[in-house]
Amino acid sequence: MRRLALEAGCAIMEIYNGPDFEVKTKSDSSPVTAADEAADTIISDGLHATFPDVTLITEEQADSHSLKSTEFFIVDPLDGTKEFVHRRGDFTINIAYVVNGIPIRGVVYAPAKHRLFYTDAQGQSLEETGPFDLEKIGTCQNISVAIPNPDGLRVVASKSHRDPTTDAYIAKYPVSDLKSAGSSLKFCLIATGEADLYPRAGRTMEWDTAAGHAVLNGAGGGVVRFDDLTPLTYGKPGYENPYFIAFAKGVSLQKP
């Protein structure tokens, strides 16, 4: 999974750093570029070749969205296409492995930010520092959530999808810092101790969250449903998520 994320990142950055690229619109009105498609081909081909018997769900292949399994890979080859299109850098490659509703392995790679996060075989999350080599793993550091300051939480929210419900929920907490970030980087900022709370009261799909969720789990954090604060699970109908809250353990979660 690490190697495929890096290979996909190389393909994405070649387009990102090149001349203007075409932006098409999918049936759900979301944007898609040649970078999404190139990364999807690299990751899909690699996973099918290595794990031919494991179901693969990927954002860019609509036919996969009706597949069902208790064990599957779920992929967003370019999470944060709007950030990519506007060359803001906050986009990621997300690859996760889900078993019985739980994302147990995940890779999140932000090629423009030179940040790479993933879980190891024991479930511990780490960040690898670049430069990144396809064959050789570089310097890695275990990551873990911070102990939140109850007098002022550090909150991270969507850069492209803010809404009144999210803002109202954030207002329930004492906040010392509020930052915006794109894509699944928000989960990783909590996982590294750079933020404490990420509420999302907007539409997301499982491929948007599974890899970041796995990384956050492996760093001691968690993700729950917004409505009843029960754990967010995967393999739901249509692979659609409810609203959710990602958090560092130690945050006293408020009900909406």
Q: Where are the regions a protein language model picked out?
A:
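N-terminal subdomain of lithium-sensitive/metallo-dependent phosphomonoesterases centered on the IMPase/IPPase/PAP
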Residues: 1-78, 99, 164-172, 228-230, ...
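Conserved beta-strand termini and adjacent loop/short-helix elements that scaffold enzyme active sites
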Residues: 26, 59, 158, 181, ...
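Acidic beta-strand-loop-alpha-helix segment within the catalytic core
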Residues: 96-187, 232-256
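Glycine-rich active-site/cofactor-binding loop and its immediate structural neighborhood
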Residues: 71-111
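Residue-level signal for inorganic ion chemistry
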Residues: 12, 36, 47, 81, ...
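Short glycine/proline-enriched turns and hinge-like loops at secondary-structure junctions
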Residues: 67-69, 85-89, 119, 237
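Oxyanion/phosphate-interacting regions
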Residues: 1-3, 9, 167-172, 187-256
